[in-house]
Amino acid sequence: MIAILKESASDEAVSHIVSWIEKKGLKTDVSRGENETIIGLVGDTTKIDPFLLESMDVVERVQRVSEPFKRANRKFHPEDSVIDCGHGVKIGGDQFQVIAGPCSVEGENLIRIARRVKAAGATMLRGGAYKPRTSPYAYQGMGPAGLDLLCEASAELDMPIVTEIMDPRDVQVFLDKKIDVMQIGARNAQNFPLLKEVGKTKTPILLKRGMSGTIDELLMAAEYIMSEGNDNVILCERGIRTFETRTRNTFDLNAVPVLHHLSHLPVVADPSHATGYTRYVEPMALAATACGANGLEIEVHDEPSRAWSDGAQALTPDQFDDTMRRIRAICEVVCQETME
């Protein structure tokens, strides 16, 4: 349920209504726009008489929200959310960003790759220090040492870092190392203890869609994080598992405009994991930009044939240079704000 207040509603009136609702045992989510203020009611709304709420002087109207996701719902928050990722980088609304770097942090080559992707125009650095792998015998990541290398690259280049967290017990480690953006990978999209734990922080969370997850399940995963108090969620479409075997996954670009319609949260697209092959990354990156994504996450490695993981889908730095030039050209046409 949402209460849409009149434009004349004062701060005191808003506080009074919020207090009245919370005394009924519900939580509230207040969204202030240019022309209206919306109070979202979260919890058992059967405790609230909508006609009584609507009779209050400053309430314009009351509307029920049928979707199970509330805080992530655009009806609760009509204006696009803009997430501050640190180092002066924001994503959402008219802010378009490119996240780039290797699949795995491998060692000193990280800084070489980071310098190249920044020079090409990437604004955020990705790299996995902890790797969820299908096989227990595959490379699992460098762990804390990998986080240290990411932090060193971030400090040198003044770039926010995006790296995956897999275990609720590691949240404090990520906080201590001041990781800018914690990524929840596809395999952990319904790891509810992890979602709740990162929700207790204020660190931005890049939440990937599960391999077989529906759009509603992605939004409900975001709801888990936001229900704990962390509204800094970035959604990521990274491809879903279908009957098609010619690509690693099927890139569901329908999800980008659908998510924008349903939610105020920023939407990033990952053409690397979606396709699984270098040759398809650029065309799908351009398509994702054209259909309204707020950003891209692209894997780049200076020697893909020697990469410790996912080399088949990594662009070389030279390929990334070319791709960024084309992304810029698309962005000049469709993005509200031109890339730097």
Give the label of every model feature segment:
Residues 139-163, 197-204, 253-268, 313-336:
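Alpha-helix-loop-beta-strand connector modules within alpha/beta enzyme cores
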Residues 6, 142, 158-167, 171, ...:
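Catalytic beta/alpha-barrel core
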Residues 96-102, 123-127, 161-163, 180-184, ...:
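Hydrophobic faces of well-ordered beta-strands that scaffold small-molecule active sites
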Residues 126-144, 302-312:
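Glycine-rich, proline-tolerant flexible connector loops at the mouths of alpha/beta enzymes
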